[in-house]
Amino acid sequence: MIGTLCRFALLTLLAVAPATWAASPEQVPTVHGLSLYGEPGLPAGFTSFPYVNPNAPKGGSLTRAVPVSFNSTNPFIITGSAAAGIDYLGQSYLYDSLMVSDPAEIFSAYGLLASGIRLDPQRRWMEFDLDPRARFHDGEPVTAEDVVFTFNLLVEKGAPFFRGYYADVTSVRAEGPLTVHFDFAENNSPELPLILGQLPVLPAHYWKDRDFSRPTLEIPVGSGPYRIERLDPGRQIVYRRDPDYWARDLPVNRGRFNIDRLIFDTYLDDSVALEAFRAGNIDLRAEMTASNWATGYQGPAMERGLIGQLVVATHNPAPLQAFVPNLRRAQFQDPRVRRAIGLAYDFEWQNRNLFYSQYRRTRGMFDGSEMEATGLPEGEELALLEPLRDQLPPEVFEEPLPIEEPSDLRERLRQALALLEEAGYRVENDRMVDAQGRSLSFEILLWDGRMQRMVLPYVRNLRRIGIDARVRVVDPSQYQVRISQHDYDMIIGSFAQSSSPGNEQREFWTSDYADRPQSRNTAGIRNPAIDQLVESLIRADSRESLDAHARALDRALRWNFYLVPQYHNPGARIAYWRKLAFPLPFPDYGLDLDAWWVDSQRASRVEAAQDDQQP
């Protein structure tokens, strides 16, 4: 599940003894939470998530920067750019979802709008009982009809993502005012109950007479912990904590959503955003630039202990960032060409000279986890790959991972030249050309000019072996249009991986998504073997089996050289003004900023110091 897909981690399946019949709802126990494998970690009647401060004070404000402007409050469609704070899956500031995850657990979730959950032992259906106290912001109750309406609305009029995400749901219906019933297709994904738990519930009475397919700047009716206080289109959105929020005292919310006002300001230039932070106009920021982290926060405020820096590691797979060649282009069809262009990437030089040695090289799809393929395949992983032997590169079975590459760039470039020669290319007048004399060339498309600092050394290495590589920078809106139309040779892509990969892998890697507009299969991969491995992974029925399936997929993708993996930070880098406080230790599988609060005494000192530094 993409992590960032939202703050919702993976949920699902209550472990129950196997059965050969579909139980009726009356025969299935009603539970407070679900776990993908085994029992959920927190018992019925738990009082709060274990990582929060249940007595955290309320009050204060938090200002954050966002790098893109917005023109809509509807994040559920592909048109428009939605404002920060309204997620399309899971609980957000504006909308509650049926369930919410505990980032201290890897595969569990607990009821939010749902006060009770029933799951058929054979996973043919599930039901949610809604909390009778649940209310939208206008006072209307949240009903089963709202859930049915939301599901159908997202599938029929929402982004194409939803149709694939909920493809294994065959029907949904209300069983009374507060119970909703979902029927599942046969051989559905084990994580499907979790996926449904992520469903945000929209008010049918508000949306039924509005055009859901179009962007809007109306302030919608929600049910979540905050209301939109103010909108300045493209520039700022302000949320105000709702003191009458119906779920404020539920165990899943206790100690969370502590800050009264949440302000998201748009800064299209990150250097301006950094200066705004240093001036005290932004309270917290995630730092993405190594040089900023090393030197950008130095100054009187840091010396006086008013600014803090955190590196927060999680147990999730490392985020995957990579150069993504577009396989829809002819020059990238040969895997030997793809391997050759990967050999020209010199991570070690970049890390030393550009990144203050802060990063680690990313090796594969699930780097740093039990799902990362290493050595040679064996056991269940080998059994999964063996039927596909004729469709996979022989190295999958014969060569261990990680792939060995010389540390010396010159030797890597010699290997790249040899691979290109095998693929039918030759060097002619310092140009790499094919048998027809056509130059091997491609353009790397960027939306942020600052990325050239990292990309240009790679381009220079490619040119050393005769490849005509170029960089083009376009504005973010043009970039999005070209991405949606697959109009690029190569981009830098990101693939957020969770500790429980599932349905989202279809959109990353499978043939069915290769030509869909807006799909995340940006590489344009069409490979029946990969398709089969993804479908098999989605239906893995145990943690051990999921790990084996993920390793098989990882191995097959890596030996096809579909991507040129770049690097990752060992943890999230967070800079903050010390008016903010947070509970320790952090949860293992996510950083929950909504468990932070404003310390009023610290805030007074920080604000006085910020006033002193104003001109």
Tell me the role of every PLM-derived stretch.
Residues S171-R173, E229-R240, D265-R329, R336-A340, ...:
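Extracellular/periplasmic solute-recognition and catalytic clefts
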Residues L89-E105, N152, L196-R256, D260-R261, ...:
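Gly/Pro-rich hinge or "lid" segments in bacterial periplasmic/extracellular proteins
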Residues D131, R214, A247-Y297, R339, ...:
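Ligand-site clamp/hinge motif
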Residues Q27-V28, V66-V68, D232-I237, R241, ...:
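Detector for C-terminal structural segments
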Residues V52-P57, T79-Y88, G116-P160, E175, ...:
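Aromatic- and charge-enriched surface segment that lines or borders ligand/interaction sites
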